[in-house]
Design a protein with these regions (language model features):
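Active-site-adjacent loop/helix segments that line or gate small-molecule/cofactor pockets in enzymes
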Residues: 1-29, 71
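Short hydrophobic/aromatic-rich motifs at helix boundaries and adjacent loops
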Residues: 2-3, 32-37, 57-63
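Active-site and channel-lining beta-strand-loop segments
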Residues: 23-43
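Glycine-rich loop-to-alpha-helix module at the N-terminal edge of alpha/beta enzyme cores
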Residues: 40-82
Length: 82
């Protein structure tokens, strides 16, 4: 898909509560993200979603994968061992 196709699909199906950049991100690695048109960007916005480790850090991916195999989410009504 292209950036424009992703944006058009989003506009048709997602509530828009704030303005957005006209970029559709496909993947990230380290501090860089790539859009669906293959253009690479340096991510200076990680504080918005608290993504301070960058993208696809191997240790983070392994830890999340292991946790998802046990319990990916539960309400804070319950106790769990992180």
């Amino acid at each position: 898909m292209t950036n424009q196709q992703i944006i058009e699909r989003d506009n048709a199906h997602v509530a828009h509560t704030y303005g957005r950049n006209q970029i559709a991100l496909e993947q990230g690695k380290g501090m860089h993200v790539t859009d669906f048109d293959g253009k690479e960007y340096l991510d200076f916005t990680s504080g918005i979603g608290v993504n301070s480790l960058g993208y696809c850090d191997p240790d983070w991916v392994a830890a999340v994968s292991e946790q998802a195999g046990r319990l990916q989410h539960t309400s804070n009504l319950y106790y769990t061992d992180p």
